[in-house]
Amino acid sequence: MNGGLAVIGDLYKSTVFHLCDWIDSESAYAVRHDLGLPDRGVLIGAAIRGKPPSAELRPEQKDSDSLPDYTVLDPLLKALLEEHQSPEELSQHGTDPALAERVMGLLRRAEFKRRQAPPVLKLSQRAFGSGWRMPIAARG
């Protein structure tokens, strides 16, 4: 991964969706012009924005096959990562405890992937990379 940089690696998926919509909106035309990009028309397009998110590890795989909708997942991740809430605390506020435990387990099991990924531009208090580390051999 020589020279890689994960520019949007610290953004939640729902934020990326909103950012893509904004980039193609009229309100972004002036910014696009200042960056030397076409200041009119579609840059990202509905075909890309409408494609279901996927890790693309196997044919026809979609994130929704194994993860909740991002309107549910992103607030849960924010609570776990940025607000340091435990699955037990989240269950006291109406979150399904089994879902919170499952997501926390997925985070732990995917730590090795984050160590292999390119550096992330830090945008939040607890970005993956510099602000978030778990032991690679963590169980749970």
Feature locations, PLM:
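ATP/NTP-dependent adenylation/nucleotidyl-transfer catalytic domains that generate, transfer
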Residues: 1-140
